[in-house]
Design a protein with these regions (language model features):
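Short N-terminal secondary-structure initiator segments
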Residues: 1-9, 125-135, 193-197, 201, ...
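Alpha-helical membrane-embedding segments
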Residues: 64-73, 95-109, 132-145, 165-178
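Soluble catalytic domains of enzymes that build or remodel membrane lipids, polysaccharides, and related
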Residues: 138-366
């Protein structure tokens, strides 16, 4: 097992132990009631692991949704409980928080509850507020007329982002009256099954502009062959290490890279050489994971759109993504190549955005 996978599961287990000990101490309840609270907490976290180990496709769709949302939300709640108790422990060491506040304390318990409810009510409400990001690029006359493109990434449709959410997003997009819709991967979350049962493809077919997309890492997790069938039903043209030239849009060229999950994918330089420069006026690359941006710049790409990072989704994970990626969010430029790394319109795991924003991007080429 890769080291990151070990850390991914080990850290929450350590956090659960730390939080469980604090919850046991702080609750002003009898042993029986404290035991029940701890068992409930462990059960919620165990669902997170169980979802990964056993999968959800064998469970009825309503129950699968409950298991996914409870299990994955518990991971974020655990993160913030850990941080809160660390702050309280530090306060106790500095004699700013009395020890009685953390032991059999009504005031301590109510304070922790109020802080957590406040954080996650805000985080959930903020998630549903989709930001419209306006981006304008001057092509110096390389496109015959102004073009409007709506771009999004990381939809993560499935057990927690159902058809009703996609319907809202389609309404946002159609209201823009775009010439083109571009999606930078992770359309599907962990399984194509809920998309098939809900006929989510019907919502994509409501889009009033051609749709082009590249694959993300989650398309591989969900079973790439089944995902490809869904894309065909939805009317999405998936560009997998291929380019398409659009003469009806002034010979705009869209290049879609396979996800870096595939170690044998073509380089961006190879893809740029696959078409004649005389037949393109402007090139846009869709590449889900924003690694090695310098290679796109060296290959002469005009604009690259990526996602994957979610900008950490919640603070302070956004600090980690900043450390990992050359650009983990927003606009960026290398030489003459422009980049935009999106935080995503959807979300993985719990539906919380804390310190980050869900968004879709409206790009105008002029």
């Amino acid at each position: 097992m890769k080291i990151w996978a070990i850390i991914f599961f080990l850290l929450p287990i350590l956090g659960c132990t730390y939080v469980g000990w604090h919850v046991w101490r702080i609750l002003p309840l009898t042993t029986v009631w404290r035991t029940l609270v701890i068992v409930a907490m462990v059960a919620c976290f165990a669902l997170f692991i169980l979802n990964f180990v056993l999968g959800l496709d064998r469970v009825s769709l309503p129950w699968a949704r409950v298991m996914y949302n409870v299990g994955n939300s518990s991971l974020f709640i655990l993160l913030y409980l850990t941080m809160l108790f660390l702050v309280l422990d530090l306060g106790q060491l500095l004699h700013l928080v009395p020890s009685s506040f953390l032991k059999n304390s009504v005031a301590g318990s109510l304070t922790v509850l109020a802080v957590m409810v406040g954080i996650f009510v805000y985080g959930n409400t903020h998630y549903y507020n989709k930001a419209r990001v306006s981006l304008k690029l001057d092509t110096k006359g390389r496109v015959e007329r102004p073009l409007k493109l709506v771009m999004m990434s990381d939809l993560h449709l499935g057990y927690h982002n159902p058809r009703t959410e996609m319907a809202r997003w389609v309404d946002f997009i159609n209201a823009e009256q775009p010439d083109l819709v571009l999606i930078a991967g992770d359309i599907i979350d962990i399984s194509v099954r809920p998309l098939l049962e809900e006929d989510v493809a019907a919502e994509f077919r409501r889009l009033q502009a051609p749709v082009y997309a590249c694959l993300g890492n989650h398309e591989y997790y969900s079973g790439e062959p089944k995902a490809q069938q869904f894309f065909r039903d939805a009317g999405i043209r998936v560009l997998r290490d291929e380019a398409v030239n659009l003469p009806e849009l002034g010979h705009l060229t869209i290049i879609g890279r396979d996800d870096r999950t595939n170690p044998h994918r073509k380089s961006v330089a190879q893809l740029m050489k696959a078409f004649s420069p005389e037949k393109t006026n402007y090139t846009i690359v869709l590449d889900h994971q924003p690694y090695h941006l310098d290679r796109s710049a060296k290959a002469g790409v005009d604009f690259q759109f990526s996602g994957h990072t979610h900008y950490g989704q919640v603070w302070p994970i956004s600090w980690i993504t900043k450390a990992i990626y050359e650009c983990s969010y927003g606009s960026y430029q290398l030489d003459s190549t422009h980049f935009y790394i999106s935080s995503g319109i959807g979300i993985w795991g719990g539906k919380f955005r804390i310190g980050t924003q869900s968004e879709y991007v409206v790009l105008t080429l002029k």
